[in-house]
Amino acid sequence: MSGETLEFQAEARQLLQLMVHSIYSNKDVFLRELISNASDALDKLRLASMRDKDLDVDTSDLHIAIEVDQDARTLTVRDNGIGMTRDEVVQVIGTIAKSGTAELLRKLRETTDAETSQELIGQFGVGFYAAFMVADRVVLVTRQAGEADGTHWESSGEGTYTIAPATDVPQGTAVTLHLKPVDSEDNLHDYAAEWTIRQIVKRYSDFIAHPIRMAVERPGSDDSEPTTEVQTLNSMKALWARPRDEVEPAEYHEFYKHVSHDWADPLEVVHMRGEGTFEYEALLFLPTHAPLDLFSPQGRRGVQLYVKRVFIMDDCEALMPGYLRFVKGVVDAHDLSLNISRELLQQDRQIQVVRRRLVKKVLATVKDLKANQPEKYRTFWTEFGAVVKEGLIDDTENRDSLLEILSVASTHDPAEPTDLTGYVNRMKDGQSEIYYATGENRTTIENSPHMEAFRAKGFEVLLLTDPVDEVWVERVGEYDGKTLRSVAKGQVDLDTDEERSAAEAERERQRTEYADLLTWLGSALADQVREVRLSARLTTSPACVVGDAHDVTPTLEKMYRAMGHEVPQVKRILELNPTHPLVSGLRKAREQGATEDSLTETAELLYGMALLAEGGELADPSRFTRILAERLARTL
């Protein structure tokens, strides 16, 4: 057979090599992956036949066949499903189009620990490539439903593969593994043995909705010849339809791996049934770790939808909001049409009811983890908290539930995050606002000038470092009757009435003393700021830049511009610390007749330092560094 030899895409080649030389101990899972792929192909064919009346295919006996040849040491997994075209074979097997692949491969190369390797591989879901853990050579023959000719693909996993047209190929896909020798030390079992196959199918794929068949030879009685009979290896019982107390944890785990293509066990299982005017069953899973494409627009979304045990679609976005896009599983609705489209699902009243119930159940499950299994909750929030917080922006119906499971870093304890209830319970007498600060990371926030007065007075501040935090705090506005207040916005006055009264005379003196400087600075920096004023929030820094209560923050400005939105630049407010030597020195220099150029340069340095201190960016870094260098040179 003449064919074309092609190279695997670079990242696919690297991942393939990791599988060929895998330190992953449980190599049995290769069969689970191949069966799962075959099951998907059968579901897709049935769905295509319902939606395309011109597709002439027989769906009366959709099944998976396992064929073994002890003498040739081969194992074949065959399905009569949708099949693939040549281009699809190249795209699906020859390349990897997942975001985050390079980073995953780097981590895999650096680790020599089997458990860590397993966890990292699980984040990717290598699927078909798992075959190379147990095979020296893999042959795939496929023909797409409705096409006349098929495709023959073959590789030994060494960086290249051959691909060629194939004739007289049955519809569907057959994957033949030329097995490596049995090696108990390397956990390579006899995968051509009937008993081994039975055990693996029972353990990993018993719930698959299509029959998994294997021809089994039975010895004849007395002098009669041995006979061959085809047996079905799996029970095909829909796991979600069984009572929860009849399902073993291991069964849940394997079903999760089937629907999610994850190799790790789920963090938590949500098994529920809806009865009444609209019946449905749902089996949902919270993963242990975030997928690599969690923040990718092309990432997988939603759960699988079935109608009366018939697969309808993957990634049913109508059943789960975007902020719960990591939830995996199955929803089996009893009263929907088999031909319902994605567009109609969005408007279907019954689906909307199911969606509301699913969301409430998932959030209630997380709340229960928070109360009773804090380690599991901590894992969940570390992996998915940044996504869940997206729900605080638009899901007003569940906002209270989301706020109950919210966890944020705080100045109260560097090691342990807090929830909003804990913050409120620790508030000082007379405190009416919940203070928060946003920034790229904890260190930047804690070192920001905006934090000085709060630190000096002992006020707890929430430290928000996810980009979404900038949006949800504005949208939520308050919690338990307490306003959410940014430490970098508006006027700050943390003094008690007694302290304020005692300091009033000094503040009035400062206002009078600095009036001229503030007016001059407002004019000198008119292109950068809209106001210059004295600060009550600074204790050690000379200056800081703040916004009014309803101003868009610089971080949000950057986010909107990155998304292609036109955002007018908001001029902010420069606050000065009247007790700082630099500020008082600038006042004296102006009073003593320093040159305008010298004063203006000092003003620019003061403003630039305030921007840098909060993690901001300078409009003209080269001018700033030139002025600073000249000033430093004069001191030497």
UniProtKB/Swiss-Prot annotation:
Region (A): 1-342
PANTHER family per record: HEAT SHOCK PROTEIN 90 FAMILY MEMBER
Cellular localization per UniProt: Cytoplasm
Region of interest called B, as start-end residue ranges on this chain: 343-558
Family: Belongs to the heat shock protein 90 family.
Protein name (database record): Chaperone protein HtpG
Region listing for C, in residue ranges: 559-636
Cross-referenced NCBIfam families: PRK05218.1
Gene Ontology terms, MF aspect: ATP binding; ATP hydrolysis activity; ATP-dependent protein folding chaperone; unfolded protein binding
Naturally occurring in which organism (per UniProt): Salinispora arenicola (strain CNS-205)
